[in-house]
Regions:
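Glycine-rich phosphate-binding loop of ATP-dependent small-molecule kinases
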Residues: 1-216
Length: 216
């Protein structure tokens, strides 16, 4: 199975990816563009050195480079379970994604969150972690919105795009994702792991009383 998480900054993609791995799919490989580029930039290859120079200078990494790095990693994993977080971010990347995972069991999850909820989360996170996320939030969201509809349109031509209302509490979103992925047999396992790993008894409730933080 290959899972793709798409959503705006602050929608909880990173949080949900980690929950899915920790509680349901322990062999899941979570791939993010930023981590893959960082890994590639330190391998000493010609491409890796080019990426390092651009990252050090704050330059934009071309789509072709991002696609190449992702494909290289995916090929190395063979038939392992994969979750791609935050990719694609352009129409070109969307078309490449379909080619990379051709004939794979591809599950695309689109996180939908209101701007108000996103802003609330970003402000809360910046206060808790002394980060200035709110200062760049509008810019990141604007960039995301410019390409999002085209990306969804491209992906939906050949695959089902599953929309998840991510305005809810963390546990409620996790439950919906598990069901939509067809992992119903994992629900009890997920509940047990949620209870054991994350919350005392009074906090276990689907859709309520979650204290975990959202990450993009």
């Amino acid at each position: 199975m290959v899972i793709v998480f798409i959503g705006p900054p602050g929608s909880g993609k990173g949080t949900q990816a980690q929950i899915l791995k920790d509680s349901v799919l322990p062999n899941l490989h979570i791939l993010t563009v930023s981590s893959l580029l960082k890994e590639k930039s330190s391998d000493g290859s010609v491409l890796g050195n080019e990426i390092k120079n651009k990252m050090d200078n704050g330059d934009l990494i071309e789509d072709s480079t991002v696609i190449s790095v992702l494909k290289e990693k995916v090929d190395s994993l063979g038939d392992e379970q994969i979750l791609v977080d935050g990719f694609p971010r352009s129409s070109l990347q969307a078309e490449s994604l379909k080619k990379i995972f051709l004939n794979k069991n591809l599950k695309i999850i689109n996180f939908t969150v209101s701007d108000e909820e996103l802003l609330t989360r970003i402000k809360k996170r910046s206060q808790e972690e002394s980060r200035a996320d709110d200062k760049v939030f509008d810019k990141r969201l604007s960039i995301y919105k410019k390409s999002h509809n085209q990306i969804i349109e491209s992906l939906s031509n050949d695959n089902e795009v599953i929309n998840i209302d991510a305005n809810d509490q963390i546990d409620s979103i996790s439950y919906k994702i598990i069901v939509k992925l067809g992992l119903n047999w994992c629900i009890l396992y997920w509940l047990l792991n949620t209870f054991l790993l994350f919350s005392p008894i009074q906090e276990i409730s689907i859709g309520k009383n979650s204290r975990r933080k959202f990450t993009s």
